[in-house]
């Protein structure tokens, strides 16, 4: 009998310990979600909307600090592939997200469609020599700014538009390629380019440019913003909570205020 009693004690102690550890793990997971730093790598075209959304999230979750790393989606994708410590990634096209997913770098089940955009042709405010895409071939138009198609989704969409309109080959010598869509906007604002191709939301935030034309929807791939948690996130619970907020009603309201078309899955 003493042996049996001893055996029962030996069995009970590990079970109790396991339960305690499980409770502690669950508690720590919730604590990390509520108190943490998160790194968000996102397409720079989202800057103004994300600034406001991050602020709103901080008000509701004062223990969380979201650090934004903004740039061209292709550049951010390569940073992640090279091991950059990122918790959440938002790209301006499916291509970059697909590449990361194919390499197993996304946390399974976290990928979300967030918003849509459109592609527009802009000129410096007050310019009258350009009234549409076809005017870009005029000799007076010397420089046309667009994103680098290999790394900037906005540049890839711009290339698709010009190709669809049978203008790309004629305009190659005039193209000024930028590192991201906000640099395109700056080139046009400062009149270092006669025209530029950006997202509608970029044009909306600047009083220094005018929208001359919107690219036909069938002239380019859909402009789709997607978000996902990275598999190597040090705090997946916190990252998931922020991504859920991005897909929620409050964030949708901000996206729509800045001209994005939101998606309700």
Each language-model region and where it sits:
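Exported/periplasmic ABC-transporter solute-binding proteins
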Residues: 13, 26-61, 65-70, 74-84, ...
């Amino acid at each position: 009998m003493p042996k049996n009693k001893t055996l029962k004690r030996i069995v009970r102690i590990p079970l109790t310990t396991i339960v305690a550890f499980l409770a502690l793990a669950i508690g720590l997971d919730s604590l990390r979600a509520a108190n943490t730093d998160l790194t968000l790598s996102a397409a720079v075209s989202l800057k103004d909307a994300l600034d406001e959304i991050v602020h709103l999230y901080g008000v509701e979750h004062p223990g969380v600090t979201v650090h934004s790393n903004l740039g061209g989606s292709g550049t951010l994708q390569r940073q992640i592939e090279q091991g950059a410590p990122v918790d959440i990634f938002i790209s301006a096209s499916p291509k970059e997200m697909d590449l990361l997913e194919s390499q197993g770098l996304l946390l399974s089940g976290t990928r979300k469609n967030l918003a849509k955009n459109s592609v527009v042709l802009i000129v410096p405010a007050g310019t009258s020599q350009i009234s549409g895409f076809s005017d870009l071939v005029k000799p007076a138009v010397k420089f046309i700014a667009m994103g680098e198609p290999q790394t900037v989704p906005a540049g890839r969409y711009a290339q698709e538009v010009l190709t669809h309109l049978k203008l790309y080959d004629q305009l190659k010598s005039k193209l000024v390629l930028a590192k991201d869509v906000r640099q395109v906007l700056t080139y046009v604002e400062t009149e270092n380019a006669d025209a530029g191709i950006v997202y509608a939301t970029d044009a909306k935030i600047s009083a220094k440019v005018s929208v001359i034309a919107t690219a036909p929807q069938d002239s380019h791939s859909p402009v789709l913003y997607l978000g996902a948690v990275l598999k190597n996130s040090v705090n997946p619970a916190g990252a998931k909570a922020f991504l859920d907020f991005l897909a929620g009603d409050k964030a949708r309201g901000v996206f729509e205020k800045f001209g994005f078309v939101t998606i309700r899955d």
